[in-house]
């Protein structure tokens, strides 16, 4: 969710399945500031939901200053994020194909794995329009391995 997108939500975050008996600390909403407090040792975090590269809601804020910044601050080294609305089935296909490409050739890098997945989606006439594949980008350590 982008900052200000829902009433009462001042910062970007992820809407999770709420617990049966929610509390103030466990309400089903993981805000960017809550993410930043996590201690992660994550090589790659996939944020394939809508607008995960959006700004933090501050007027004039840069992209990636919201949820993405929180994950980097928490310890993620790479992120897959989206720059706008995503179509759910296309997001599933692109992330699945991207992870397969990365598993097959990890030394090629995360960005290359995404490029290959985008190419496969573009080759399908039902998903050739950029609406389906263009929202996604790898940020952080996405390049090829040097060794």
Model-assigned labels for residue ranges:
Residues 1-147:
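Catalytic cores of enzymes
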């Amino acid at each position: 969710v982008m900052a200000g997108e829902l009433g009462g939500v001042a910062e970007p975050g992820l809407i999770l399945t709420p617990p049966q008996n929610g509390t103030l600390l466990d309400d089903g909403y993981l805000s960017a500031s809550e993410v930043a407090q996590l201690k992660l040792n994550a090589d790659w975090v996939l944020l394939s939901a809508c607008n995960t590269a959006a700004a933090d809601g501050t007027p004039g804020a840069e992209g990636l200053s919201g949820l993405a910044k929180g994950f980097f601050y928490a310890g993620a080294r790479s992120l897959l994020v989206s720059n706008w609305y995503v179509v759910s089935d296309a997001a599933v296909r692109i992330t699945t194909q991207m992870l397969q490409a990365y598993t097959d050739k990890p030394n090629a890098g995360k960005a290359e794995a995404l490029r290959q997945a985008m190419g496969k989606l573009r080759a399908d006439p039902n998903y050739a329009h950029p609406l389906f594949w263009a929202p996604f980008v790898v940020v952080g350590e996405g390049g090829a391995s040097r060794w």
